[in-house]
Amino acid sequence: YVFKISSAAEKRSILDLQHAALDHLGTEFGDGVWPCACRTRNRKIITRINGPDDTRYMVRMLTYVTGTPLVDTKPHSPQLLQNLGTFLGRMSRSFERFTHTETQKELIWNPDNGPDVIHTYVEHITDHKKQSMVEYYGSAYESVVGPVLPTMRRSIIHNDANDHNVLIADAEPDNPTSWRKQVVCLIDFGDIARSYTIGELAVAMAYAMLGKAEPISAAAHVVKGYHAEYPLNE
């Protein structure tokens, strides 16, 4: 089990969104793929406890999903990266049928807020070369991507498919000679938000490229799997 203690500043509606999304995905994907909420004796999913300073904290317990984080799985074969894309594409298709009143609109990690975040914090980058690079790509995003944003699909997105949140397991557990791996789960829904659906893929691509000798090729494998499951039209 995983026992989660939320920040005292956390909004209840955000936790409700996380659990509603998990319930939705659990129904669409089947039992055992996603963490499930455990209820208290009073049948509550979320309850409150007092901290050492009498501050009230929301707590909950989730089932534990077995798997190895992608960051600890080597190598990242083309098959595995494509499987990651397929998994995310299936999730994006599922989220087309999911809505919630909470959208985490103000979340700093919401892709909607990217340009504002860059404008607000770029001055704090002390390395002038890196600062110029961020300004360049921030400007390019606004001039090239900005005009087409109104035409892009929007949905709830997990928004954090980094290599610590993607869990991997054997694709053929009953075959001891097989080295094939597959994605079995995506954990940590803390950054879930309503934004551009393509952001789901963008986050995964960024992390898939890290430390790769051929980063563009690694990203392409993720895109291939995603597109096969959830065709891109952007």
Describe each PLM feature range.
Residues 8, 67, 184, 192-194, ...:
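Activation segment
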Residues 5-56, 73, 78-82:
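A conserved alpha-helical element in kinase catalytic cores
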Residues 99-100, 116-159, 169-181:
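An alpha-helical support segment within catalytic cores of ATP-dependent transferases
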Residues 197-231:
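Active-site activation/catalytic loop segments of kinase-like enzymes and analogous catalytic loops
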Residues 43, 55, 59-73, 116-124:
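A glycine-centered beta->alpha junction motif in the catalytic cores
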Residues 2:
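Glycine-rich ATP phosphate-binding loop
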Residues 41, 74-130, 154:
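A cross-family kinase active-site recognition segment
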Residues 165-200:
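Catalytic activation segment of kinase domains across protein kinase-like and atypical kinase folds
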